[in-house]
Structure formats: C-alpha cells, structure tokens
C-alpha cells in the first residue's frame, strides 16, 4: 500500500523541508488538541468538589482561547505547506510527462491512444497529487493523532480502560487491508476504461464531420453509450469497495464506544475512575473517530494514487526509439545527402517498406519523388527526419552518418510540410510565426507571398488575425496547405520537404508556388513528393517509387524518354488538364 510513497521518494527528498514543517506543525496541533478534553474533565471534577470559582472559569476560558488561536495559526501553515506541496508535485509530474511525450517517436503514438495519454496527464496525476496531500495528512494524522490520543488516555486516565476500548482495532485493520488490495485492482481497471472513453470522445469530436457525412450519429452514440456503461460498471465496482469502508469503521467505532462506556462506568462504580475522567475518556474516544475513518480513507487514497502513479510511470519509462548520439559530429550545415542501400520495415509491417534505396542529392538540388499511394515516398522522408530507428544501409550528410547528427540540429535544418496539415487553434499569423517566432511583419508578408496566399488572406474576416479553429477547421484544404507552406518557408530551412503539400490547390496556384520556391531557394535543397507530376518537371532528379523500390530515376526529359510509368502518368495528367481547360472555356 505504502509503496507509492517509496516511488515518490525523489519528490519528498527534494522538498523535505516543506513536508517537515507541515508534519511538525501537524503533530504540534495534535498535541495541543489533547489539552481541552483533560481541562474539561478537571473542570467537571472541580464543580463536583465545589471548588469551581469565577477566577477558575476565567482561567479555563483563557486557556481554551489561547489553545484555539494556536491551533488555528499552526493549522493554516501546515495546510499551506502540505497541500502546496501536492500541487507542486502535480505540476512537476505534468511538466515531466509533457516533456517526455514531446520526445517520443511515432511508434510510441502508434501503441498509445491520445485519449488515454490525456487521462494519464489529468485524472491520474490528480489521484497522485491527492496522495501527496490528503494522503500524507491522513497518514500522519491518523497514526500520530491516534497514537497521541492512545498515550494520553493511558497515562492520564486508565491503561486498563484504554486497552479494553481498542480491542476492535485489529479487526478493522485486517478488513481495511483486504479492501485496499481490491481498490488498487479495480481502480486501475476503471482508469483504463476512462482512458479508452476519453479517446473515443476525442475521435468523435474531431471526426464529427465524417460521422455526419456518413449518417453514423446513431451508431457513434451507441458505441459511446456502451463505453460509458463500461466505465460506469467499473467505477461502481470501485464504489462498492469504497462503500464498505465507512460501515466497517462505524461498526467497530461503535463497539469501542460500547466497551468504553460500559467498562468505564464499571470502573467509576468501583471508584477506580472519577466521573470527570470518564467524561474526558469518552471525549478522547470521540476524537479517535476521525483517525479511524482516516485510516479507511488512507488505504483508499494510497491505493488509488499507487494505481495512477503506475500508469504515469509506465508512460515515463517508455524509452524513445530514436536517440541523440553520445558523441555527436560537428557538422554546421548539411551538404550532399546520400542514401546508400537503405532498407526499412515499419514495426507493424510484415514486409520491407523500402528496399535497397540508393541516390545522391547535391546541395541546392531539387528532388522530386513520385509514385502510387503506398509506394514508399513518405517513408523515405521519415528516414531523413529520423522518425524511426534506422534500418539497413546508411544515410549521410556531407559524409557524416545521420545517426551522428544531433536530432535538434538535423530537424532544425529541415522545413517539413507533411501530408496532414496540422494548424494550431490560433490566428493565421501565429501559425505562420511558428516557423520563426521572432520574424518581422515584412518576413511574414514575404512567406505569405511565396505561398501564394495573399488573395485568400484578404478574403478572411480578420486577415492575419483570423482564428483558424481547431486543427484549421475554419479553413479550406488549400488554405491550410498554403499556411503550412508559409510556416515552413518562414524558417528559411536548408532543406525544404513538401510531402504532397500541393494536392488541394489548382494547377495555376501550384505553378506559382513552385516558381516562387525555385526563385527564392537557390542554393538550398528541396524535396517535393507529389502525385501531380507537373510539380516536379523542373527537378534535378526525379525518383519514381513502386512497392518500396526505385522503379525509375532521372530528369523529366529522361523519364519521358523511358516510356515507363512516369511518361504514361504524365501524358494522362496533361490530357486531363487540357480537358479541364477546354471545359472551362
């Protein structure tokens, strides 16, 4: 049960002073709270003996006031230190988790659902935070407060009566221990189910347009209801165990009261105890109700926190597949890029996705990569970006193996515009500035012009300050593509990669963007992956991919002379463009 505290030992060591202050003040409050019941018993005995005076009354009132003020002040400070520490721990763990997620490679996200990761960063961290706040409170308060009360009752009143009154406690300890083991297991299942539900909601909200387009609202709601019912059932199993704690504690506390009153009255009749001492004893016994309940809550909180921390640590313990070199090469800028006999297989694939890929790109050249869907075009780029562990063969920059180049430096050279154009829920300007945070307005306008976005920009309601919505939902596909291109151009990268990034624009706009890139990126390397071959006519080298291998290679003219797939596809596209132009006329 307490293994969660051991797992969080690094935090308690780092912030030992905060928790030491909290615990010392909490213990001091516990000791101070022992005095009022004893004073009450003394006052009753004074009244019974006829020795109670006005001065005595004022004395008791004064003592009560001082003790109450001391408890109030110390309680404020221990609560501030203790619960402030819990919030701090949650902040540190959440920051650590987020930083870890940002270093993960694609295989990690292929194995883990986004909704479940969100649940680990919210619900699970809250459960762990509760452990370092309320959990520590109940641990210290329930054990030390109960021990203080126990010793006070024994030394100041009667050890005989004290031992008799705590006879039910071992039974309670056994019962609560059994409940705790069940809580850990069932709470883990409930959190896993909640993570799956969270992921389902995320998918439904982000894909609501597709759901409506295919009239699947009813089916989606049905699946959601099934998952909600599953979460409900698992939480009810947790609640069932939760509901056993309080009745168990109440039953055993009642037994303690019964023993205390019955046996205490017997001792009073035998003159082994005064009436005032019996009253004080029962007040102390009443004060033990909180720590007894707290023990039940302690088991509950600790087991929940332990289950949640295990889920968080499971994510944090996942090591990225792609790491920085231990001895990085001192390469300031990329030169020639050489792929030499590169083969690669995705972790989830059963066959090679790239086979014996070899080609050389001189610095400043433009490379076009064409081919059917799934032919391996994007896989080549993922190897260039080091998104996956390397396969066979080698990739070098200026003769330096790609594995010897620090990831930040490598990706800092590259401006990548992927197939799925992700825009952030910010303004158009903020999305473009993502490529260069300190860019001037002139640089922003230049990037917009190069991406051929000026005309569309004037049509937006607030121009550059227009909010694009979640993932750019307020924009058309072509607009999202051009903002993504402008964002990449803003960084003026040494290597620009356009991964089918012109598919949503017309041929005229595509030609204008390609023209701007050629004019403004002289001396810098560009990769263009496309299905529309007009986008790569000007390329210095064109690779035609088919089934993970290079089926054809050469310039535009050389490939036309080959009478292969490239020529057939090019002539078909030219005919289609001519027919479109004729229809438009």
UniProtKB/Swiss-Prot annotation:
The keyword Transport applies. The keyword Disulfide bond does not apply. Residues 19-304 form the ABC transmembrane type-1 domain. SMART domains: AAA. InterPro entries: AAA+_ATPase (IPR003593), ABC1_TM_dom (IPR011527), ABC1_TM_sf (IPR036640), ABC_transporter-like_ATP-bd (IPR003439), ABC_transporter-like_CS (IPR017871), P-loop_NTPase (IPR027417), Type_1_exporter (IPR039421). Its EC number is 7.6.2.-. It is found in: Cell membrane. Induction: Induced by several classes of structurally unrelated antibiotics, such as erythromycin, fusidic acid or linezolid. It is an enzyme of class 7 (translocase). It comes from the Bacteria. The chain crosses the membrane at residues 21-41, 57-77, 127-147, 149-169, 249-269, 279-299. One of its GO terms (cellular component) is plasma membrane. Keywords: Antibiotic resistance, ATP-binding, Cell membrane, Membrane, Nucleotide-binding, Translocase, Transmembrane, Transmembrane helix, Transport. ATP binds at residues 371-378. One of its GO terms (biological process) is transmembrane transport. GO terms for molecular function: ABC-type transporter activity; ATP binding; ATP hydrolysis activity; ATPase-coupled transmembrane transporter activity. It is a multi-pass membrane protein. Inhibited by ortho-vanadate. Heterodimer composed of YheH and YheI. Belongs to the ABC transporter superfamily. PANTHER family: ATP-BINDING CASSETTE SUB-FAMILY B MEMBER 10, MITOCHONDRIAL (PTHR43394:SF1), ATP-DEPENDENT PERMEASE MDL1, MITOCHONDRIAL (PTHR43394). Overexpression reduces the sporulation efficiency possibly by modulating the function of KinA. This is Probable multidrug resistance ABC transporter ATP-binding/permease protein YheI. It comes from Bacillus subtilis (strain 168). The gene is yheI.
């Amino acid at each position: 049960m307490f293994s969660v505290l051991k797992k969080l030992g690094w935090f308690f060591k780092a912030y030992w002073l905060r928790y030491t202050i909290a615990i010392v003040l909490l213990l001091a409050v516990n000791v101070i709270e022992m005095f009022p019941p004893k004073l009450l018993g003394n006052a009753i005995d004074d009244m019974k003996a006829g020795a109670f005076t006005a001065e005595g009354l004022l004395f008791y009132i004064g003592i009560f006031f001082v003790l109450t003020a001391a408890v109030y002040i110390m309680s404020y400070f221990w609560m501030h230190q203790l619960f402030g520490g819990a919030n701090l721990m949650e902040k540190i763990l959440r920051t650590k988790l987020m930083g870890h997620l940002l270093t993960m490679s694609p295989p990690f996200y292929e194995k883990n659902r986004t909704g479940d990761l969100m649940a680990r960063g919210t619900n699970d961290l809250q459960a762990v935070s509760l452990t370092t706040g309320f959990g520590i409170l109940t641990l210290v308060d329930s054990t030390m407060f109960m021990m203080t009360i126990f010793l006070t009752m024994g030394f100041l009143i009667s050890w005989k009566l004290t031992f008799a009154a705590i006879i039910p406690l071992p039974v309670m300890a056994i019962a609560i221990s059994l409940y705790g083991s069940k809580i850990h297991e069932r709470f883990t299942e409930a959190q896993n189910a909640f993570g799956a539900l969270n992921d389902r909601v995320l998918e439904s909200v982000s894909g609501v347009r597709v759901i409506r387009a295919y009239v699947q609202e009813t089916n989606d709601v049905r699946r959601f209801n099934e998952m909600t019912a599953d979460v409900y059932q698992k939480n009810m199993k947790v609640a069932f165990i939760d509901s056993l704690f309080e009745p168990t504690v109440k039953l055993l506390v009642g037994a303690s009261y019964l023993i205390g009153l019955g046996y205490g009255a017997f001792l009073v009749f035998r003159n082994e105890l005064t009436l005032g001492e019996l009253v004080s004893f029962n007040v102390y016994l009443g004060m033990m109700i909180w720590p007894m309940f707290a023990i039940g809550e302690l088991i509950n909180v600790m087991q929940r926190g332990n289950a949640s921390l295990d889920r968080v640590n499971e994510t944090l313990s996942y090591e990225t597949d792609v790491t920085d070199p231990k001895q990085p090469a001192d390469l300031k800028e990329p030169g020639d890029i050489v792929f030499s006999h590169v083969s690669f297989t995705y972790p989830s694939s059963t066959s090679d996705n790239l086979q014996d890929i070899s080609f050389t790109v001189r610095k400043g050249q433009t490379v076009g990569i064409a081919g059917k869907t799934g032919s391996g075009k994007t896989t080549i780029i993922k190897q260039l970006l080091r998104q996956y562990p390397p396969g066979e063969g080698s990739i070098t920059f200026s003769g330096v193996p790609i594995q010897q180049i620090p990831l930040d430096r490598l990706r800092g050279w590259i401006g990548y515009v992927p197939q799925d154009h992700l825009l952030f829920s910010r303004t158009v300007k903020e999305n473009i500035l993502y490529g260069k945070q300190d860019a001037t307005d002139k640089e922003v306008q230049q990037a917009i012009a190069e991406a051929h976005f000026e005309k569309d920009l004037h049509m937006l309601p607030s121009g550059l300050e227009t909010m694009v919505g979640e993932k750019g939902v307020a924009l058309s596909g072509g607009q999202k593509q051009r903002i993504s291109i402008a964002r990449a151009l803003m960084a003026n990268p040494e290597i620009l990669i356009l991964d089918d990034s012109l598919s949503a624009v017309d041929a005229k706009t595509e030609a204008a963007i390609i023209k701007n890139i050629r004019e403004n990126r002289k001396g810098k390397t560009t990769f263009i992956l496309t299905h529309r071959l007009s986008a790569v006519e000007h390329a210095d080298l064109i690779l035609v991919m088919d089934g993970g291998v290079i089926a054809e290679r050469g310039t535009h003219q050389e490939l036309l002379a080959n009478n292969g797939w490239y020529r057939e596809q090019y002539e078909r596209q030219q005919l289609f463009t001519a027919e479109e132009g004729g229809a438009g006329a």
